[in-house]
Regions:
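Residues forming the flavin
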Residues: 1-51, 57-163, 167-187, 191-534
Length: 534
């Protein structure tokens, strides 16, 4: 009998195999247990003196009669049944030309891959470079300050997530998540992402995975073009007929998936100019904070810090002001990672976080950000974009106009005293830092809320608010500052037919998995409407 067995717990105080723990949970001898497959694995650190690994598994168990009845009486044990995948009925309307996807981030890659698998021969257009060239350009920027507006942390194969921690978590509960994770594994991601409660691939594994997805699209009859910057849409009778590239080349398109990413500000401006439905939306801005990873490990795991089965600890922290108008929270926490320069425009400083798969840098970093909305940046579809740009340019100027970032030790920030770079970590941001009061590069309502929030976080995580941490600014690209309006069922733009806004850049996702899922659903919507390309 194949059983789904939840909450199989193994204490780190014990030396026990997973098979032994399953047998103990079920009350069966070892010889009655067949194959075991992990469905989910999580760390339960609620009791610092007895941290456990908690597994959900699928197991083949030789049982029947009374024993089977006894097992199934346990609320953690059920008889396993294969989940039925939703069927896809392909549409019948003919496409006037192959579909085009703008942007090779997670949303664009999945939108293209899904249609390639069903014979739609999509054309994927990426404004930046392939991963290998992009990595060289980014490394040059970090080492020398030589900025390339066409190839950077935001633009290029894989999107902004290529230089991140590679988190594959999401709050969206969708049965297609498992299928997407399997696609990632098939493309080169490690298999443990299929069951880890907090899966991540790291920037190093993610780069290989992205290349695998692009290759698969080409193998299935699609095509990928780099250095293909879409600067305009070919619109007739409020329907998109094609796209126009930088340089004037026109490409016909039977449908256009717009997965441009959250930093494609020139694309946003073009859409607004062309009358495409686009509105401002709230987002958040702030700083990156760096602590010794050992401090976070001790705060989260106590005496088990450093245990080989735990890895580098993460955290998620939230603080609401007394009047409930502002929230400070950690975002995109990168255990064992580094702070990176993430500008996409000349003359602006942007910071982000990144980790390798092993998360072994010895430094924990996270964004600490505060919510902003129209009361802060005003009216207008692109008001949020201008708000971001203003503080990025302030940071650039304050740090010496060289892509150095303004930074301040936590103690001086909390005390509003003379800023310094003295801290307990070796600062990881490159090309370098300039000691600067962060009050000069962020609005007062952000820095004031951060001070309150960090003080609160220190009561939740031991040592968090003590001296020794470093703050680096500015973090402005937490999510898209706009939403490109679309129909909830058909995914089509509310103003222009055959245009399908998609992913994080369109305001419908926040992270690799939710963006990939949105690309998946947009692709299905197009396939349910149109027939494959002949």
């Amino acid at each position: 009998m194949k059983l789904k067995i939840n909450n199989v717990r193994i204490s780190l105080r014990q030396e026990q195999t997973l098979e032994q723990a399953v047998c103990r949970k079920c009350g069966i001898p070892r010889e009655a247990l067949g194959s075991v497959r992990i469905v989910r694995k999580a760390v339960d650190a609620r009791k610092k003196n007895d941290i456990c690994l908690n597994y959900h598994v699928l197991a083949e168990v030789e049982t029947g009669g009374r024993q089977a009845k006894r097992l199934l009486a346990d609320r953690d044990i059920t008889q396993y049944q294969e989940q039925q995948q939703p069927t896809l009925e392909l549409g019948t309307l003919p496409l006037s030309a192959p579909p085009v996807v703008i942007g090779a981030g997670p949303a664009g890659l999945l939108a293209a891959l899904q249609r390639a698998e069903h014979g739609y021969k999509p054309l994927l257009l990426e404004r930046g470079k392939p991963v290998a060239q992009r990595v060289q350009d980014v490394q040059r920027f970090w080492q020398t300050g030589e900025f390339n507006p066409a190839s950077n942390v935001q633009f290029g194969e894989g999107g902004a997530g290529t230089f991140s921690d590679g988190k594959l978590t999401t709050r969206v509960n969708d049965p297609m998540m498992a299928e997407i994770l399997q696609l990632f594994v098939d493309a080169g991601a490690p298999e443990n992402i299929l069951y880890e409660h907090k899966p991540h691939v790291g920037t190093d594994k993610l780069r290989a995975m992205v290349q695998g997805l692009s290759r698969r699209i080409a193998e299935l009859g699609g095509s990928v073009r780099y250095d293909a910057h879409v600067v305009d849409l070919d619109i007739k009778n409020n329907a998109v007929q094609g796209v126009i590239l930088d340089g004037g080349e026109r490409l016909a398109a039977g449908a256009v998936v717009l997965a441009c990413g959250h930093s494609a500000r020139d694309t946003y401006a073009m859409l607004a100019r062309r009358g495409v439905g686009i509105v401002a939306k709230p987002f958040a801005i702030g700083v990156r904070i760096e602590h010794p990873q050992e401090l976070i490990d001790r705060a989260q795991y106590g005496s088990f810090a450093g245990h080989h089965l735990l890895g580098a600890a993460d955290y998620a922290l939230v603080y609401h002001t007394q009047d409930k108008t502002r929230t400070a929270y950690s975002f995109c926490m990168c255990p064992g990672g580094q702070v990176v320069a993430a500008a996409s425009e000349a003359g602006g400083v942007v910071v982000n976080g990144m980790s390798m798969f092993k998360r072994d840098s010895g430094i924990a970093n996270s964004a600490l950000v505060v919510n902003v909305d129209s009361r802060d940046f005003g009216d207008g579809a692109l008001a949020g974009v201008e708000f971001q740009r203003r503080y990025e340019q302030l940071a650039y100027a304050a740090a010496g106009s060289s892509y150095y970032a303004p930074a301040q030790d936590l103690d001086s920030f909390l005390k509003r005293s003379t800023p310094s770079l003295e801290c307990l970590v070796q600062p990881s941001y490159r090309p370098g830092l300039t000691a600067c009061s962060l009050d000069k590069v962020l609005p007062a309502y952000v820095t004031d809320t951060l001070r309150e929030g960090i003080t609160s976080f220190g009561r939740k995580l031991a040592g968090y608010a003590d001296g020794g941490a470093l703050l680096t600014g500015v973090e402005t690209r937490t999510s898209a500052p706009v939403r490109i309006e679309r129909d909830r069922q058909s995914y089509v733009s509310l103003t222009h037919d055959l245009l399908y806004p998609c992913g994080e850049g369109a305001g419908y996702a926040g992270g690799i998995m939710s963006a990939a899922l949105d690309g998946y659903h947009v692709a299905r919507a197009i396939m349910e409407r149109f027939a494959p390309v002949k």
